[in-house]
C-alpha cells in the first residue's frame, strides 16, 4: 500500500446562484494579462448547454481522457507512437472560436468624440488583433439558458438521452455548473505531455505546469477531457488552474472558494492508495468507475492507515486534517458527492453534490410543503433531470443520482420537522441509509457551516523555505507575461 495525500474539493450545486463571482475573482488573480485574455481557470456554465469551450464533453471530437484497449488504459489521443507521428499536427484541440475571441470596447470614442447629431458608440474591439469585431460568442453565452433551445440540444449529455424526451429538456430544469481543473489522480494531461512539463505534486496532488520545460506541443490541451489546460499565445506556454497553491501552502482556501457568495465550496484532504489507481481506472463497465474510485480512498481514522501514512512521510498535521476533512464525509460517509464525468477514467478530485432544488420546484411548486413520501415517487419518475444528471456525474447510472437526491430530500424533510416540532417516520430515514445524527451533521455542513468547517487545509510542511504567506503577491514566474511575473 502506497499512501498519498490529495487536496480535493466538493461543490454543492444546490446552493450555486450563478453569480460568476468565482470566475471574476479567479480571472483578476490569475489570467488578467496579455496572452491569457480568453482563459477562465474557473467558469460557471448553465446546463443543459454546450459549455466553454464549445462541446468540451464531446471526446469523439477532442480525444480527451482515457479509454480501455484490450483491458489496458490508453490515452484516447492514441499511443505514444501515434502522438509522436503527429507531434507537429494536433487537430484535436479547441480553436479560439470554440472558446471565444476576447474583446474590449473603444471607450475613447465616447470620451474624445466631438459634438455630433448622433450619440457616439463604443464598438467592440478584439483583444487579439486590435480590429473591430462582431461579438458572436462568449464564455457564458448560454447563461440562464440563453439560446438553450438552440445550443442545448447540442449538449453531449442531452444527445445521450432518449430521443423521445430530448425536446422537452428546456421545460424541465436548469442548473449551474462551476468548473475548475479537476486535479485528477490519474491525469491524462500529465501522461500526454511529450516534454514532461505537466506534473502532479507529490505532497498535495495538485497538477501544475513547469513553465521552463513546456515546449508548446499542446497535447495537454487536447488530452484534458475537461478542457482546463490553456495555451498562452503570448508566452507560448501551457497554463492551467493551480488550485491557488500559494494560498493552500499558507493554509488558506482557493480564491474561488474564498469569494464564493453561495458558500458552495468545501476543501479538504483525502488519503488514497496509489497502488490501486490503475486498477480503479481500468474497470470494464463505466458505471462501476464511481465505486472503483471510492475503493481507492483510505479511512484516515483507521489507526493502521494513520500509522502507515506517518511511516511513509505524510506529516501528522496532514493526517489530522484528513481525519477532519469535510469532503471525506460527503464523499465516503454520506455518499452525496459525485465525480464529474467519471467515464473519462482520470479519477477527478473535484466532486459535486447534485442539485435537488430544480426537481423540487418542478414537483412542489415554489413554497409548497410536500412530504418526502410524496417526493420519492416523483424523483423516480422524473426521467429527464435524473437522466441528465446521471450522464453528467455517474456515467449514466441513475441509481446513484436517485439515492443522493433522496438523501437530500429526507434531510430537508427531517430538518423541517425539527423546526416545526413535528415527527418524521424513522423508517424513512433508515431507507436512505442514514441516521438522525448523520442527517443533522449533513445539515450543519451543507447549510450553516462556518469558515473553518468548510476549509480544513493544513499548511505546507517546508521548514527550510521562506515565509510563504508574506510572499503572496510578489514575484512568481521569472519571464515576462507569466502569471505572477514582476516584469
UniProtKB/Swiss-Prot annotation:
[3Fe-4S] cluster binds at residues 193, 214, 220. It catalyses: nitrate + a quinol = a quinone + nitrite + H2O. Residues 7-36, 172-203, 205-234 form the 4Fe-4S ferredoxin-type domain. Binds 3 [4Fe-4S] clusters per subunit. Its main location: membrane. It is a peripheral membrane protein. GO terms for cellular component: membrane; nitrate reductase complex; plasma membrane. InterPro entries: 4Fe4S_Fe-S-bd, Nitr_red_bet_C, Nitr_red_bet_C_sf, NO3_Rdtase_bsu. It comes from the Bacteria. One of its GO terms (biological process) is anaerobic respiration. The keyword Ion transport does not apply. GO terms for molecular function: 3 iron, 4 sulfur cluster binding; 4 iron, 4 sulfur cluster binding; electron transfer activity; metal ion binding; nitrate reductase (quinone) activity. Its EC number is 1.7.5.1. The keyword Translocase does not apply. It is found in: Cell membrane. [4Fe-4S] cluster 3 binds at residues 181, 184, 189, 224. [4Fe-4S] cluster 1 binds at residues 16, 19, 22, 260. The beta chain is an electron transfer unit containing four cysteine clusters involved in the formation of iron-sulfur centers. Electrons are transferred from the gamma chain to the molybdenum cofactor of the alpha subunit. This is Nitrate reductase beta chain. It comes from Bacillus subtilis (strain 168).
Amino acid at each position: 500500500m502506497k499512501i498519498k495525500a490529495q487536496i480535493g474539493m466538493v461543490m454543492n450545486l444546490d446552493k450555486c446562484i450563478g453569480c460568476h463571482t468565482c470566475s471574476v475573482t479567479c480571472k483578476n488573480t490569475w489570467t488578467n494579462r496579455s496572452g491569457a485574455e480568453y482563459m477562465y481557470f474557473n467558469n460557471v456554465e448553465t446546463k443543459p448547454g454546450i459549455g466553454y469551450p464549445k462541446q468540451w464533453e464531446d471526446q469523439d471530437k477532442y480525444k480527451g481522457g482515457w479509454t480501455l484497449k484490450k483491458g489496458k488504459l490508453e490515452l484516447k489521443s492514441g499511443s505514444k507512437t501515434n502522438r509522436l507521428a503527429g507531434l507537429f499536427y494536433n487537430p484535436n484541440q479547441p480553436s479560439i472560436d470554440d472558446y471565444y475571441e476576447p474583446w474590449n470596447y473603444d471607450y475613447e470614442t465616447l470620451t474624445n468624440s466631438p459634438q455630433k447629431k448622433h450619440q457616439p458608440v463604443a464598438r467592440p474591439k478584439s483583444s487579439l488583433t486590435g480590429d473591430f469585431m462582431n461579438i458572436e460568442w462568449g464564455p457564458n453565452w448560454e447563461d440562464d439558458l440563453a439560446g438553450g433551445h438552440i445550443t442545448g440540444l447540442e449538449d453531449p449529455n442531452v444527445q445521450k438521452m432518449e430521443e423521445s424526451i430530448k425536446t422537452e429538456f428546456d421545460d424541465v430544469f436548469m442548473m449551474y455548473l462551476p468548473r475548475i481543473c479537476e486535479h485528477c489522480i490519474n491525469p491524462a494531461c500529465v501522461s500526454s505531455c511529450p516534454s514532461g512539463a505537466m506534473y502532479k505534486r507529490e505532497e498535495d496532488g495538485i497538477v501544475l505546469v513547469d513553465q521552463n520545460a513546456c515546449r508548446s506541443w499542446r497535447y495537454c490541451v487536447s488530452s484534458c477531457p475537461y478542457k482546463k489546460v490553456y495555451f498562452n499565445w503570448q508566452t507560448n506556454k501551457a497554463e492551467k488552474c493551480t488550485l491557488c497553491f500559494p494560498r493552500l501552502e499558507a493554509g488558506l482556501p482557493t480564491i474561488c472558494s474564498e469569494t464564493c457568495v453561495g458558500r458552495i465550496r468545501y476543501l479538504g484532504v483525502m488519503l488514497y492508495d496509489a497502488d490501486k489507481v490503475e486498477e480503479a481506472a481500468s474497470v470494464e463497465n463505466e458505471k462501476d468507475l464511481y465505486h472503483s474510485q471510492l475503493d481507492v480512498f483510505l479511512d484516515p481514522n483507521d489507526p493502521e492507515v494513520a500509522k502507515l501514512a506517518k511511516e511513509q512521510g505524510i506529516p501528522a498535521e496532514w493526517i489530522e486534517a484528513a481525519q477532519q476533512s469535510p469532503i471525506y464525509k460527503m464523499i465516503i460517509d454520506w455518499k452525496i458527492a459525485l465525480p464529474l464525468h467519471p467515464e473519462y477514467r482520470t479519477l477527478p478530485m473535484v466532486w459535486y453534490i447534485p442539485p435537488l432544488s430544480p426537481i423540487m420546484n418542478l414537483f412542489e411548486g415554489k413554497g409548497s410543503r410536500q412530504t418526502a413520501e410524496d417526493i420519492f415517487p416523483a424523483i423516480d419518475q422524473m426521467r429527464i433531470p435524473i437522466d441528465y444528471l446521471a450522464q453528467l456525474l455517474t456515467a449514466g447510472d441513475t441509481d446513484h443520482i436517485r439515492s443522493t437526491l433522496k438523501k437530500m430530500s429526507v434531510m430537508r424533510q427531517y430538518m423541517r420537522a425539527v423546526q416545526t416540532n413535528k415527527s418524521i417516520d424513522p423508517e424513512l430515514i433508515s431507507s436512505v441509509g442514514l441516521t438522525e445524527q448523520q442527517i443533522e451533521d449533513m445539515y450543519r455542513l451543507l447549510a450553516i457551516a462556518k469558515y473553518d468547517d468548510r476549509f480544513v487545509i493544513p499548511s505546507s510542511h517546508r521548514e527550510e523555505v521562506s515565509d510563504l504567506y508574506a510572499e503572496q503577491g510578489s514575484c512568481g514566474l521569472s519571464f515576462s507575461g507569466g502569471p505572477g511575473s514582476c516584469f
